[in-house]
């Protein structure tokens, strides 16, 4: 796989729900891999057709925590994925989750972002991301897709 950065055409934001649905709906996850730690972590979800959806943590690139968002795996997803949803909650300084906001609508503050998938077994958490920004360094995690190679 070539090096993918958040800023090239192969990458897309967590809030691009239609792109995520295009990859996941109708597929099942056969394996979940994790490499790196904290702000360079990449979660890789291997699908039944060989496609891999990668969720990348974000490092804001400064000495502080602005623009830094983690990615943590959720449940072991079982079954065929029927739908995908994103929940973003603006968090309070008291570490209590605040109100649900439109994904991608916040760029200043702190948030918990969850990517859910739905199967015949119900709602399952695929990715949880937490972080903050001051409006300058970037918001949320990002994704990339490695298409299956067919001969």
What does each of the following model-derived ranges do?
Residues 2-151:
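Surface-exposed, interaction-prone regions used to assemble/regulate multi-protein complexes
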């Amino acid at each position: 796989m070539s090096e993918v950065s958040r800023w090239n055409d192969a990458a897309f934001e967590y809030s691009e729900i239609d792109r995520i649905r295009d990859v996941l709906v109708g597929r099942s996850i056969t394996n979940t891999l994790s490499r790196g730690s904290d702000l360079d972590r990449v979660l890789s979800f291997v699908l039944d057709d060989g496609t891999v959806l990668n969720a990348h943590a974000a490092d804001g690139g400064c000495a502080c925590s602005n623009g830094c968002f983690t990615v943590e795996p959720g449940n072991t997803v079982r079954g065929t994925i029927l739908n995908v949803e994103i929940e973003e909650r603006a968090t309070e300084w008291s570490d209590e989750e605040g109100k649900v906001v439109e994904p991608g609508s916040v760029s200043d503050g702190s948030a918990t972002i969850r990517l859910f998938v739905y199967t015949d077994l119900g709602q399952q958490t695929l990715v949880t991301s937490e972080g903050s920004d001051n409006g300058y360094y970037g918001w949320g995690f990002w994704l990339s897709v490695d298409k299956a190679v067919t001969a």
